[in-house]
């Protein structure tokens, strides 16, 4: 008797099967090529734009700076026999949270005192100040509405 006829062809050993599966195109079947690690430049996907580094990384309001006390040196009050000692700086670094509760100095303009540092940035957006009321100086019968 003859051996039984096999319906399916025998599978290739695993090493050769893997080589056959990595053939990229049927026309390249002559030499077994694995797919390239990097496709050529035209087929690569474009890289997303890199986040730009900021030229000014933090605004001045976000930077915490130590507040130094004013140096008090009054040479008039000293006696002639006394030697002037260098001023002792006992600075306590106040963080930004403590500074927010302090009142601004009196000599600052009202806009800066009311709005803080952001008031200088918003100053150009504020409405123009109204002209002083002139209805008392020249009452005219043709103007019914006063400018103020």
Swiss-Prot record:
Pfam families: DUF5451. The keyword Cytoplasm does not apply. The keyword Glycoprotein does not apply. Keywords: Early protein. Residues 134-148 have a biased composition (Polar residues). Coiled coil: none annotated. Residues 38-57 have a biased composition (Basic residues). It comes from the Viruses. Residues 1-86, 122-148 are annotated as: Disordered. Belongs to the Epstein-Barr virus BLLF2 family. This is Uncharacterized protein BLLF2. It comes from Epstein-Barr virus (strain B95-8).
């Amino acid at each position: 008797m003859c051996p039984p006829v096999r319906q399916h062809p025998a599978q290739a050993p695993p090493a050769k099967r893997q080589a056959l599966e990595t053939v990229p195109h049927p026309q390249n079947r002559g030499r077994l090529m694995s797919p390239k690690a990097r496709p050529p430049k035209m087929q690569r996907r474009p890289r997303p734009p890199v986040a730009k580094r900021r030229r000014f990384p933090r605004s001045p309001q976000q930077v915490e700076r130590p507040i130094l006390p004013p140096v008090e040196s009054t040479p008039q009050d000293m006696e002639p026999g006394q030697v002037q000692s260098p001023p002792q700086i006992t600075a306590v670094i106040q963080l930004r949270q403590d500074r927010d509760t302090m009142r601004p100095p009196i000599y600052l303009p009202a806009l800066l005192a009311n709005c803080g540092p952001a008031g200088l940035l918003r100053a150009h957006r504020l409405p123009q100040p109204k002209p002083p009321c002139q209805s008392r100086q020249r009452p005219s019968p043709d103007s019914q509405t006063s400018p103020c």
